[in-house]
Amino acid sequence: MIVLSNGVRIFINSNMNKDIYLGIASFGFENDIGEILGIAHLLEHILISFDSSKFVANASTARKYMSFWCCSIKGKSNYIDSINTLISWFFNNNKLRDNFCLNDIKNHIKELENEYYFRNEVFHCMDVLTFLENGDLYNGGRIDMLNNLESVNNMLYNRMHKIIGPNIVIFVKELNKNCLMLIQNSFGTLPSCPMSFSFPNFSNIDGKIIMMPSPFYTVMIKVSLSISNVISIMCLFETYHLIDYETVGNDLYVTLSFVKESDYENFINGVSTLKFNNVPNYTVLSLCDDFLMNAYLCFPWLSNDINNYLSTVRYSQNMFKNLEEDIQNSILLKKYIVVYPHFSKTVFNKNDSQMHKIVILDCLNEIKEDQLPKLNVNLMKKQTKNEIFIKYNDSSLIKYIIFAIGYKNNILRGNEGVSIHHQFSSEDIKSILESDTFLKYSKSKPAAMYQYLLLSFFVSGYSIEDILLNRESTIKLLKQYNNKILFGKKSRYDITTKSNFVCGIIKNKNINNNVITNTMWELKKKGLIYSMEHTKIDKRIFYIFMFTIYPDEVFLYLSKKFLSHCLIVSKTGNIEDFSSMKKDVIIKLC
């Protein structure tokens, strides 16, 4: 690790897929509390800008931090180009960017509203911890920010000037003289301390039960913020599923999720306890770069390589014993937060400023101090990398898709089905997918199904009526029978579903993945969409799908860009109506 004179920390991570990865601590949406919620997320969208034909890049805003990364595309750009591109997001002519075009701000606010819509159609993305801290359940920014553009612009300026050197963490794939000089002349010029300070007023959030949509019964237990506990949690994350951590303000929580309600109840009632007796004696942790960046930003006193702490702390069973006792003591004192699966839209006792509804209760269970646990919690151990292949006509398809999305597993779409890479045993996956809570959770967001239902409409010979009879699966893709797609006179189908989206097939003699990606970014810059999924159907034909609150505008843009198209425009309604979706099936007799 290299520390610049102003406190910027630089790590060499030759194993990551990114060229450069930058994080800014104390810069997430937790800092929006008391201001306009969504400023942090808006700033992230404004800052990142790149040529998608030369680079792959992304950014994200979390509760405590913001992160950005960039990677060159081989043959289109090089490593130093990536470094310069990421630097350009923050600096212009060696000066910190703090003046933003109002028209760009407007478009990005529209994009944020599309992201909110997308996330609420596909996920349950409510952050209860920030809500308990006096924020909202959703803190990513809404379209009503357009009503306060002058204030928003001032807050963006002030937020940029709160970036300081000690809060910057940079991972680079390699560190040569040129790369180091570029970083020193940009992020190395940031001040060591901010010009102004703000201290968010956090509420006491312990001893609460939150009832909300969730696939698991989750308990977040407050533990001491010590180097020993942090390294212990990292070792546990490397070893087991359903164990992670959260940081709220200056507090550290271990999160433990249960598939069965009885296991959860035994734990919070002191009948069972955690025993970490089977954690391997790690000398190196193979944590992904996202997890490492999260750790360095949440725990700024981690000033060395994570793996160095394994020997410095001299992690042992005694280290885990201390964490076990810390957890058990917090359970006894109700220093924890519970997320209890709850799917009713009509039962609630709290709402945030955006009128999102939720149930929050006080923990009332009592554990006697002399009560000794009789059982050990069964933990799901991580396996070596496994792969599942699910055919499109499998009735379990949607469950597996939601499972994969929830765990951020890679989903690879093929002609006949999807491949999902994971680290679960077959028994553990079965127990999760067959649990009542996961079944309710997977059915609580039906919008994810539309993408696959309508894909099958275009590539199979089946009618929409046949396809709708098989909602739990999709009709098997019939590409192996060499179906040929002909573009007829009708290029638009208007339907009514539970969601706003545009999908369909587009054709162009020069179409490829790059053209599709560029199209997505053009639509994003206009504030018309947040994300676009695509599947290659033939050499010159792609299927695309995107949620949007501006379906007519998206259709107009796509119909002008791709002359050969057949698109479905869905608008929200109480009763689904697919009656306009008629197609001709031509059978060629040989």
Swiss-Prot record:
Q: Which InterPro entries match?
A: Metalloenz_LuxS/M16 (IPR011249), Peptidase_M44 (IPR005072)
The EC number of this protein is 3.4.24.-
Any idea which residues are catalytic in this one? E44
Q: Which UniProt keywords apply?
A: Hydrolase, Metal-binding, Metalloprotease, Protease, Zinc
The record's free-text note on cofactor binding: Binds 1 zinc ion.
Tell me the protein's name.
Probable metalloendopeptidase G1-type
GO biological process assignments: proteolysis; viral life cycle
Q: Which family does it belong to?
A: Belongs to the peptidase M44 family.
Cofactor(s), names only, from the UniProt record: Zn(2+)
Molecular functions (GO terms): metalloendopeptidase activity; zinc ion binding
User: What residue ranges carry the coiled-coil annotation?
Assistant: none
State the SUPFAM superfamilies in the record: LuxS/MPP-like metallohydrolase
The residues that the entry says bind Zn(2+) are: H41, H45
What is this protein's function?
A: Seems to be involved in viral proteins maturation by cleavage at Ala-Gly-|-Xaa motifs.
Q: Does the keyword Metal-binding apply?
A: yes
Which is one Pfam family of this protein? Peptidase_M44
